[in-house]
Every structure is written in structure tokens, then in C-alpha cells.
Amino acid sequence: MNRINILVPDLPESVNDAVVVKWYKKIGEQISSEDNIVDIETDKVMLEVSAPCNGILNEILEKEGSIVKSNQILGNIVESKNIESKTKSKLEKSNKYFIKDKNFNISFKEKIYNFPPSIRRIIRIKKNKEIFNELNYIKNQENIIEEKLNDQSFSNEKEKKIYENRIKMTRLRQKIAERLLETKNNTAMLTTFNEVNMQPIISLRKKYGEFFEKKHGVRIGFMPFFVKAVVESLKKFPEINASIDKNDIVYYKNIDVSIAVSTPRGVITPVLRNADNMSMADIEKKIKEFSIKGIENKIKIEELIGGNFTITNGGIFGSLMSTPIINPPQSAILGMHLIKERPMAINGKVKILPMMYLALSYDHRLIDGKESVSFLVTIKNILEDFNRIIINV
């Protein structure tokens, strides 16, 4: 028998370990090389581990919940070129009733195997064997059983006293919590605010949006304008494109901008590499790609590593103003917010303008107030007159 090991994928140096989330195959089940057999989760992404060959799952060495390292053995497969389906022995039953026998020598999990999925789910949620033992399985009569299971008379006293649902934090949520606490404890974080008139950007999008979409195949949003404004501002204020490493200040020559992306598992920050060399279309396409990958849990670890500055947009959720938290080891983060029409005094006259509050949180250990305020004002000025990028002022 040729046994092939199932290995944890290569993890980058910044990722210490991962946790086994879910096995999709059981020992003895046939597997093809295309199958995703187990999911593992790092503090950044969910990784799918595919079978290295065709065969039968022979052994699971790391169960769900286990902490594993890079290239650690998760289990092994007995390689087989000609796989024959292994028929699982059927449980003893009649066509009409499921046999109830206290001496029936199989596990509770196996006993409920022949119930329809909807019924198995309810039984597992109830976690009450007495409920199961009171039921006869009537073929194709799921509604009767569901009604029986949901009857309050079947609920024990302990169930009635439970008013909470306790679940284990995901690795991503744990890491987010750790990093937020790390930022609070290890940085001198301060936030400065400003506001920007978004009418010039709105007018640009309205004027060239249709042409842009026809040429590049993607709609132009607000984020590329902010990325470009940040890139130009970082060139003028190198101390913001830097970080503290013990007693040293590290200045970065490349401009890698992290973009906060909301996913079902939490917020992640994939990186726009060398954003200063990207066109508006490149930025928009990459952000769209990150969003899709985030929803589908397909973001790669290398896409999350190495950003030097972060942009986050709470405005898409309706936030009018906030104080974004620095993404360590970075030294600053820009917060975008909701665009809202407000009366503004312009040259002695009141005008209704689409305004957005901007927030820059920064590490005061490295960045002084003068630099932080000037940096944010530079972003504001570029957004209100995008021609500044063309003539570099």
C-alpha cells in the first residue's frame, strides 16, 4: 500500500500556525485528487487543502480544532488508481418505522443517520436522546416529526433556562482582537479630522464614468481617487510611509496600500502592491477582485502581507464619522465616511455640498501633529482638485 501524506500548505514566516476547521471526508471514504478534504484557518485566511492523489482516506492525525504548523502532516491517503465505491452498511430498519431498541449496539450519531437532513439537524440542535427515543421514523412524514421535536413539552428544564448561544471565536476574529489590543497598548494613537467637498470627484465620475466602464470593463468608484491621493501624499510625507522597529525607524521605498475589505468572517486588509505604479483602472479592478475573493474566502496569505498604509471606508455602512484604529506595524490609517449633503459657507454664500469627513489615525511616537495634519490637508486638496496630480502640486 502506497500511503501519501496530506500536508499543511506552506505558511509564510508571519503566520505562526493554523487551526483545523473541518474535515469533509471520513476515514474509509474514497477521494479524488480534485476533492477539498479539509479546511484550515490561519489568523488571516481560510485555506482549502486538496487531496494529493486518488485513493481512500486512511488516517486523520489532526482532528478539528487542532493547531498545526506549516507542512505538518494532517493525515494520509492510501493511493488507488481504480477506486471502487465502498458501500456503507445500512442500518437495520423497516420501510415504515425506525426500530427503537435500547440494546441496539450503535452510537447515537449512527442511529439518526437515516433521518432526513432537516430532522437530523433539529435532533442535533436539541441534543436530547430522550426526544429521539420517543420518536418513530415515519417515512416521508418529516413535518410530523418536526412538529413533535419543536413541541415545548419535549424540552427539558435545562433547555428552558438557556438564554445564550456561546460559540468559539474564529482564528481571524481572535487575531483581530489581539491586534486591536496591541495597537491600544503599544502605540500612542491619535486621530485628526478634516472634511472634503466631494462634488469635484462626483462630477468627474458622472462625466467620464460611462466611457471609463466601456474602455476598462469596470465601473469607477470613489476608492481609486482616494488611493491616488494617498499615494501622492505619502511621497511628500515619507515619515507616514514608515514604521517603528524597536529603536529604529524603517522608511519604505515602495508604496503598498492596504484596503480594508469586509467579509463574512471579519475585516481583512489585502494589499495594493506598488500602488504608485497602478492606473485608476488597475486599482478598481484589484479592489473588485479582493471583494469577490473575500466573500468566497479565497484571499491568499501573500495578498495580505506587507502593506505600509491602510484605507478603510466606513461610509459604505453609513458611518458619518469614526476614529479608525491603526493596522500594526503600520503607523497610520485613513478613514473614509458617508457622503452627506450639508450647508457650507463658500465665499460668503451658503451652498449645499456633498461633504465627507476624513479621519487620519496615526502613531504619535513617529508622526508629529504638523505632519499628520498637513498630510490629511494634502489628501483633501487633491480630492477637491484632482488636476493637482497632473501638475504635481
UniProtKB/Swiss-Prot annotation:
Active site feature: H364, D368
E.C. numbers: 2.3.1.61
Reaction(s) catalysed by this chain's protein: N(6)-[(R)-dihydrolipoyl]-L-lysyl-[protein] + succinyl-CoA = N(6)-[(R)-S(8)-succinyldihydrolipoyl]-L-lysyl-[protein] + CoA
SUPFAM superfamilies hit by this protein: CoA-dependent acyltransferases, Single hybrid motif
Alphabetized Pfam families for the sequence: 2-oxoacid_dh (PF00198), Biotin_lipoyl (PF00364)
GO molecular function: dihydrolipoyllysine-residue succinyltransferase activity
UniProt GO cellular component terms: cytosol; oxoglutarate dehydrogenase complex
A GO BP annotation: tricarboxylic acid cycle
In-chain residues carrying the UniProt-annotated modification N6-lipoyllysine: K44
Lipoyl-binding domain sequence ranges: 3-78
Pathway assigned in UniProt: Amino-acid degradation; L-lysine degradation via saccharopine pathway; glutaryl-CoA from L-lysine: step 6/6
Alphabetically ordered keywords of this record: Acyltransferase, Lipoyl, Transferase, Tricarboxylic acid cycle
Cofactor: binding comment: Binds 1 lipoyl cofactor covalently.
Function: E2 component of the 2-oxoglutarate dehydrogenase (OGDH) complex which catalyzes the second step in the conversion of 2-oxoglutarate to succinyl-CoA and CO(2).
Annotated PANTHER family: DIHYDROLIPOYLLYSINE-RESIDUE SUCCINYLTRANSFERASE COMPONENT OF 2-OXOGLUTARATE DEHYDROGENASE COMPLEX, MITOCHONDRIAL, DIHYDROLIPOYLLYSINE-RESIDUE SUCCINYLTRANSFERASE COMPONENT OF 2-OXOGLUTARATE DEHYDROGENASE COMPLEX, MITOCHONDRIAL-RELATED
Subunit-level organization: Forms a 24-polypeptide structural core with octahedral symmetry. Part of the 2-oxoglutarate dehydrogenase (OGDH) complex composed of E1 (2-oxoglutarate dehydrogenase), E2 (dihydrolipoamide succinyltransferase) and E3 (dihydrolipoamide dehydrogenase); the complex contains multiple copies of the three enzymatic components (E1, E2 and E3).
Protein name: Dihydrolipoyllysine-residue succinyltransferase component of 2-oxoglutarate dehydrogenase complex
Gene encoding the protein: sucB
